């Protein structure tokens, strides 16, 4: 996907977006139908209130506002039932429950009166209705005129729950969403700041790898998404409408954060930046195809939700073919993740300290997303679903980010730290399939962020990759009368030179040669690259060469 695909996709989605039927709704309806749906709202059991303003030509009299609730004998029994006509749909209404508002001057509670505009008579109705029920319920508002010549209505409705800023314009299934989003925003800001601090430490140690940068990017996008959600819901709390474009952008960023994090997990499972420096060409193609497919299904999911979801039904995002396709892709990603981790552990068993908790923690995460979607579709009551799903979804994202932040913290006490190869070593690899040397963890060498560890600088790596002290002196070339010292793991220890011609430190000087002239050239220690890239420098000496 090219660099301009992101803005283009955003404009496409915004173009598909329809104006949301918010808790303040207005419109102008003209249709040949005799029964139509207007809007829905989830009222509290005691504080629900509908304020309305209706106006229509007196010649179109008489029209009715019908109030259905979510009982199986009410709204589900009439909506999209082609075998029922207008009268049958009105018959399920219980007049004793005041579920009918007759828009005429004869019905006092409708507040209707005849007005004149441009020589034409109109019925203008301004009034309200309170709602009482045994629990929170979805209420559906419809307009009818059975046996007439169609419907015509100019309407304006305000649906509220109490007078508090946190509840007034919110449907009962949305209670707590704004507070929840604000709380998680603050938590994710803390996670982002901690990840930036850890990234600064890792950069100083040349351990700030691409996968950790992806984690920081995912956390940053998550923060931006939650910020936009808070802006949307805050504006919605004030006017009951909100800015739907901000909500769509927030959803896009939320999905982008999820996709970045998912890609990072698959890359880490394959050992990228932990046991290998690059992904093979075939692996890169597979990842590109998979992420493209996942992005397309997410896009289709957004378009389907915005364009094809029926506002007269309470639907969840994943209640669509694209939603179930997303769940299937999530399971496919988990299978890929399992295979990648097992292969990595097979070749690098010393990385079990990282990969075992990593695999266990994110197995729960991989299953949490589709299980949440299935429970939301079939197990949570519709009048409470949106607020519950919002909290669970944010909790799942928080779990994923918090676990990664903990297991990758750059602390000497962290035995799960995954990185041991410096970023400067990855860039000089010659083959894309070349693996890192077998080494447990570079984290055990963390002593200071700013001062080099001189002891490790002059240590010699053993065959298993760990640093070992020098037990035998390395015979540097010496000449007559030259005292020489040998470095060991204790930088202050001086070792006497070996026996030279049977006399310690003494050798005959050839005739005609001064002591100074007999000195042979000493060569600086050279750093030799072995197979892979050892973490520490080692000292090697060159043989004596004549002047």
From Swiss-Prot:
Keyword Glycoprotein in record: yes
Keywords recorded for this protein, A-Z: Glycoprotein, Membrane, Transmembrane, Transmembrane helix
Disulfide bridges in this chain: none
Predominant subcellular localization, coarse grouping: membrane
A cellular-component GO term for this protein: membrane
Record organism: Xenopus laevis
Superkingdom assignment: Eukaryota
Lipid bilayer topology: Multi-pass membrane protein
Residue ranges crossing the lipid bilayer per the database entry: 2-22, 182-202, 214-234, 248-268, 283-303, 325-345, 356-376, 388-408
GO biological process, one term: response to pheromone
UniProt-annotated glycosylation sites, renumbered to this chain: 28, 102, 243, 443, 453, 464
Location relative to the cell: Membrane
Official protein name in the record: Transmembrane protein 145
UniProt xrefs under PANTHER family: INTIMAL THICKNESS RECEPTOR-RELATED, TRANSMEMBRANE PROTEIN 145
Record flagged with keyword Transmembrane: yes
């Amino acid at each position: 996907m090219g660099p301009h695909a992101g803005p283009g996709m955003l404009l496409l989605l915004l173009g598909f977006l329809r104006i949301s039927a918010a808790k303040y709704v207005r419109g102008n309806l003209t249709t040949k139908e005799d029964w139509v749906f207007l809007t829905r709202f989830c009222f509290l059991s005691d504080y629900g209130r509908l304020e309305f303003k209706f106006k229509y030509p007196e010649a179109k009299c008489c029209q009715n506002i019908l109030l259905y609730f979510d009982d199986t004998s009410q709204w589900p029994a009439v909506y999209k039932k082609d075998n029922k006509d207008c009268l049958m749909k009105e018959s399920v209404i219980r007049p004793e429950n005041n579920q009918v508002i007759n828009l005429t001057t004869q019905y006092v509670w409708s507040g209707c009166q005849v007005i004149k505009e441009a020589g034409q008579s109109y019925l203008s109705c301004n009034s309200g209705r309170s709602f009482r029920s045994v629990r929170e319920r979805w209420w559906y508002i419809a307009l009818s005129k059975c046996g007439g010549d169609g419907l015509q209505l100019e309407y304006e409705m305000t649906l509220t729950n109490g007078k508090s800023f946190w509840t007034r314009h919110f449907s009962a299934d949305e209670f707590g969403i704004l507070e929840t989003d604000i709380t998680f925003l603050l938590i994710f800001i803390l996670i982002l700041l901690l990840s930036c601090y850890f990234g600064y430490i890792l950069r100083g140690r040349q351990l700030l790898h691409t996968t950790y940068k992806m984690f920081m990017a995912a956390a940053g996008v998550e923060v931006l998404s939650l910020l936009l959600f808070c802006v949307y819901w805050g504006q919605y709390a004030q006017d009951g409408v909100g800015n739907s474009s901000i909500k769509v952008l927030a959803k896009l960023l939320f999905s982008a954060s999820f996709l970045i994090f998912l890609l990072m997990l698959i890359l880490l499972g394959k050992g990228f930046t932990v046991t290998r420096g690059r992904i093979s060409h075939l692996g890169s193609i597979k990842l590109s195809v998979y992420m493209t497919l996942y992005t397309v299904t997410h896009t289709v999911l957004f378009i389907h939700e915005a364009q094809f979801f029926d506002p007269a039904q309470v639907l969840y995002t994943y209640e669509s073919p694209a939603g179930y396709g997303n769940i299937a892709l999530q399971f496919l990603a988990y299978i890929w993740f399992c295979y990648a981790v097992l292969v990595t552990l097979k070749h690098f068993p010393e990385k079990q300290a990282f990969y075992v908790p990593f695999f266990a923690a994110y197995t729960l995460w991989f299953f949490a997303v589709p299980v949440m979607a299935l429970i939301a579709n079939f197990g949570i009551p519709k009048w409470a679903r949106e607020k519950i799903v919002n909290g669970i979804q944010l909790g799942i994202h928080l779990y994923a980010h918090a676990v990664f932040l903990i297991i990758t913290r750059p602390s000497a006490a962290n035995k799960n730290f995954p990185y041991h190869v410096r970023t400067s070593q990855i860039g000089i690899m010659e083959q894309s399939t070349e693996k890192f040397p077998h080494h447990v963890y570079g984290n055990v060498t963390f002593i200071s962020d700013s001062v080099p560890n001189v002891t490790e600088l002059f240590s010699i790596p053993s065959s298993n990759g760990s640093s070992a002290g020098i037990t035998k002196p390395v015979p540097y070339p010496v000449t007559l009368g030259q005292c020489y010292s040998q470095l060991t793991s204790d930088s202050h220890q001086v070792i006497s030179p070996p026996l030279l011609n049977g006399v310690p430190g003494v050798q005959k000087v050839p005739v005609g040669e001064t002591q100074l002239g007999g000195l042979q050239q000493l060569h600086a220690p050279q750093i030799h690259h072995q197979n892979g890239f050892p973490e520490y420098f080692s000292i090697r000496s060159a043989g004596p060469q004549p002047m």
